[in-house]
Amino acid sequence: MKVSVVILNWNGCDMLRTFLPSVVRCSKSGQVEVCVADNGSTDASVEMLREEFPCVRIIVLDQNHGFADGYNLALQQVEAEYVVLLNSDVEVTEHWLEPMISYLDAHPEVAACQPKIRSQRQKEYFEYAGAAGGFIDKYGYPFCRGRVMEVVEKDEGQYDTILPVFWATGAALFIRLADYREAGGLDGRFFAHMEEIDLCWRLRSRGRKIVCIPQS
């Protein structure tokens, strides 16, 4: 398998119904699988997936392990060259995978990348979670292209260049599975939030590169 798109879910039945159709529709390829890793949901998520999305692979976890360990456990059951850690509230667009696949295929020194992320409600603006790639200032504060503190910019093509970044957002993290495993995966001590920054930091410490691919 070339790519596994893995969505972590916890009691998000309605959210999956809303956003999963775009992922399935825009990820049709014999070399791409779409997986939902269910983090011990108590709602009807698993039953709904089985009935309404038979093409989606379901990975059932025994309880809510949080974001980091939930993904670590799920990715133990995945075998693909690349994996995409995709939030359950992300709507993807046509051909979203191809630019990232092509770039990683051509640049073996790059461990991970992210697409441009725009707001789902105001599509002309960047999304707070990741925008156009993440950095860390000299005081250790994380920020993004397209976002300063709580203010997001309008996307006017100002960040349409492929650029090395310090960290890629966990909302849509495209990563080589080998790099993920060699770096030790996400740190479970980060139950939720900041875990992707820590992972990217460790990848960079190993001499690997992180890139934003705004064509995706």
Name each region found by the language model.
Residues 21-31:
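Short, acidic, metal-binding catalytic loop of nucleotide-sugar glycosyltransferases
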Residues 60-78, 88, 99:
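Glycine-rich, basic loop-to-helix element that forms the pyrophosphate-binding segment
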Residues 115, 133-165:
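Short, flexible, basic/aromatic active-site loop/helix in glycosyltransferases
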